[in-house]
Structure formats: C-alpha cells, structure tokens
Design a protein with these regions (language model features):
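Pre-recognition alpha-helix immediately N-terminal to the DNA-recognition helix
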Residues: 8, 93-96, 103-107
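Arg/Lys-rich amphipathic alpha helix in sigma70-family domain 2
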Residues: 40-42, 53-73, 87
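DNA-recognition helix of helix-turn-helix
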Residues: 56, 60, 119, 125-149
Length: 149
C-alpha cells in the first residue's frame, strides 16, 4: 500500500513540510496514521482517495502541533530528479506561493494539480463538489495574483 501510493504521500508531505529536512518526518507520520487506520478502512472509496485523506489530515495535524512551538515556517523545494533548471525554478516559485495559502486551499490546489476530479476532491476534503469547484476557481485566481507580484 505504502509503496504503491508513495508518490501521493510525498507530494502531500512536500507541500506541508516547512523545510526539506522535515519531509521524511511528515512521511513517517502519514505512514503511521495509515498503518493505524487501515483496519478501519471500509473500502467505500478508492484506496488512493483514502490515502490522500489520511495524508492531508495527518500533515495538517502535524503542522498544527508544530505551530504551537515558535519557529519560522518556510517551504523548501528540492527536486533532485528534475534536470531542467528553469522548470525547477518555476516550480520552486509555484510551491513558494502555494505555501502561503491557507491549509484547506493548499490541500485543494494540491489535489487539483494532481488532476483529481471534483468528486474525489470533495470526498477527501469533506466539501461538496460545487464548493470545491468554486473554491478552486478562487484559489487559482489568488495564485495568479500572488505569482505575478
């Protein structure tokens, strides 16, 4: 399960971790949450949807716990597998802008970037599909403004 969905888990951790060094900590927290929650998985949704939901809520909880301690939160991007430096810089900028969004907005845009359908995003976040569509439109508009500054 973990090996099959590793990419999903790392992507969520990457967006929520305050720095490159913490991504593995977040990943371990998610794996532990998946291990604990697996006996309760009823199979009513796709496994990937369940993994996304657990990963998002675990990372958000981890961020909340860390926010209780005073520290600066900054998204550090490291894409060692990306050879194109210009694309890497653009991706760095995009993730830096995304990191300034609120928790729910980050979750929504991450799922949208993964090309997840609105129904699946709704199932993961607990929002209605209509609300997901409206929020994504507003988030994309906000990102354009933030990115062009």
């Amino acid at each position: 399960l973990i090996e099959h969905h590793k990419r999903i888990i790392y992507k969520v951790c990457y967006v929520y971790a305050p720095g490159r060094g913490q991504i593995d900590d977040y990943f371990q927290e998610v794996v532990l949450a998946l291990w604990r929650g697996f006996p309760d998985f009823r199979g009513e949704s796709k496994t990937a949807t369940w993994v996304y939901r657990i990963a998002l809520y675990t990372c958000i909880s981890f961020v909340r716990r860390r926010m209780r301690r005073p520290q600066s939160v900054r998204l550090s991007v490291d894409l060692a597998c990306d050879d194109d430096m210009q694309a890497r810089e653009q991706l760095d900028e995009l993730y830096a802008v995304i990191s300034r969004l609120g928790r729910l907005d980050r979750a929504l845009i991450l799922l949208w970037l993964e090309e997840r359908p609105a129904g699946e995003i709704a199932a993961i976040t607990g929002l209605s599909p209509g609300n997901v569509a409206v929020k994504l439109t507003r988030i994309r508009c906000k990102l354009r403004k933030m990115y062009n500054r």
